[in-house]
Amino acid sequence: MGAKPAIAESVARSALVEAMRAGDSVRGLTSPNPPVGAVILNAEGEIVGVGATQPPGSAHAEIMALRAAGERARGGTAVVTLEPCNHTGRTGPCSQALIAAGIAAVDYLHADPNPVATGGAAALAAAGLKVRQVSAPDAAGVSDALIPWLLSVREQRPHVTLKFAQTLDGFTAAIDGTSQWITGTQARQWVHADRARRDAIIIGTGTAFADDPSLTARYPDGSLRENQPRRVVIGRRDLTAAGDVARNLRRLGYEQYPSVEEALVGLYAEGARDVLVEGGAGLASAFLEADLVDAISAYVAPVLLGAGRGVLDRALVQTLALAPRFHRVETIALGEDVLIEYAR
């Protein structure tokens, strides 16, 4: 394949941003496969195809983008958020599809850590394509949808986000147990959109008994979103003998595990790669004690209580030097509330 002038760096960066947005749009729909985004640029550097991973067993992102581009892909560049796969599973290898389409160059963001699928970059280079791994762009409002999946491959368990809503002085409920609602409408709507991007929502039996949650993902009008995460309860208490308690979960269906470790093992084996822990305080403490929290979504409301229930129900450490620390990833204003995203 003949040499081709490199596309402008600004064009390549813009294409990567579009690919990341495409991947982010399918979070919650692809597990156990990664939510990948792909963009095809023609030989002049114009976007002619955008694709994202389809549900398991369907087309990968590169195939969707190539279908959209058609013959315009020939001599062009593929920009992908994950190294194109090089194996045949339920679908064929994306590396070979890119070669067959006449693609001249490939930019990819993350190397594929899956030993079964890796090798795409080497196969593309061996076929004469210009291949390079690029870094993530510093673009506002663009998130890397692959971070949970990458961790799940590395750790062989789902990525865990601990989510809670608290007052300015750190309480999740008043002394009498009331907590609805600490945050405002915008924050609660954001939570429902976030739930739809996860493979499972996890609560403890205490929360199941006390709050009778549905653990659904809904639109602002109350209707159910298309993607509903699995409902998971951790604890040994039997919800089926609960009488009038936990009726919503018994009506909608749920899975139950005795411990956090067994839950993550079971969920990973069944294809979950990205889970959200919503409480309560005992469960949050258990996940942190087991060093199994990878990210935190803290919704902070401009409310003061002075006393009440906290995010955790016990001390994690005896001295500050040993406390687990996270770094801030993003801060999002949601009406009068603030969502602060942290990661390890």
Residue ranges, per PLM feature:
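Enzymes that bind and transform nitrogen-containing heteroaromatic metabolites
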Residues: 2-33, 49, 90, 122, ...
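Proteins enriched for Cys/Gly/acidic motifs involved in redox and nucleic-acid/cofactor modification
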Residues: 28-32, 121, 130-165
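Active-site beta-strand termini and strand-to-loop segments that position acidic
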Residues: 42-43, 154-155, 343-344
